[in-house]
Amino acid sequence: MNLANYFPVLLFILVGIGVGLVPMFLGKILAPSKPDAEKLSPYECGFEAFEDARMKFDVRYYLIAILFILFDLETAFLFPWGVALRDIGWLGYASMVIFLLEFIVGFVYIWKKGALDWE
C-alpha cells in the first residue's frame, strides 16, 4: 500500500480544518475585547429578558415534527423511484405500491388516533 496515494485526501482534510480554524484564531487574536456588564448581558430585541429562555413545549409539537420527518422521507424515496420507473419494471412498481400502502395505513392510523388534532 502506497501512502502517497492518500496525500490529496490528507491535504483536503487539513485545508478544510484550516479554513475553519484560522478565522476563529485570527478573530480571537486581532479583535478588540472590552467586556463589560452590558455586553455580557443577554439581548432580547433591545429589552431585558422577561423570563427564562427555557420554556416547556407541548409534546404535540414534537409529534408533528416526527411525523413531518417521516412523511418527508417518504417523498425523498418517491423522487428517485419516479425517475427510474421505466428502468425498474413491474417489480419496482409493485414494491413502491406496497411501500406507499404501508404509509397510507400508518397515516390513517395516526389520523384515527387523533395525533393530528389540536384539542
Swiss-Prot record:
It is found in: Cell inner membrane. Its EC number is 7.1.1.-. It catalyses: a quinone + NADH + 5 H(+)(in) = a quinol + NAD(+) + 4 H(+)(out). The keyword GTP-binding does not apply. It comes from the Bacteria. It is an enzyme of class 7 (translocase). The chain crosses the membrane at residues 7-27, 63-83, 88-108. Keywords: Cell inner membrane, Cell membrane, Membrane, NAD, Quinone, Translocase, Transmembrane, Transmembrane helix, Transport, Ubiquinone. GO terms for cellular component: NADH dehydrogenase complex; plasma membrane. GO terms for molecular function: NADH dehydrogenase (ubiquinone) activity; NADH:ubiquinone reductase (non-electrogenic) activity; quinone binding. The keyword Manganese does not apply. It is a multi-pass membrane protein. NDH-1 is composed of 14 different subunits. Subunits NuoA, H, J, K, L, M, N constitute the membrane sector of the complex. NDH-1 shuttles electrons from NADH, via FMN and iron-sulfur (Fe-S) centers, to quinones in the respiratory chain. The immediate electron acceptor for the enzyme in this species is believed to be ubiquinone. Couples the redox reaction to proton translocation (for every two electrons transferred, four hydrogen ions are translocated across the cytoplasmic membrane), and thus conserves the redox energy in a proton gradient. Belongs to the complex I subunit 3 family. This is NADH-quinone oxidoreductase subunit A. The gene is nuoA.
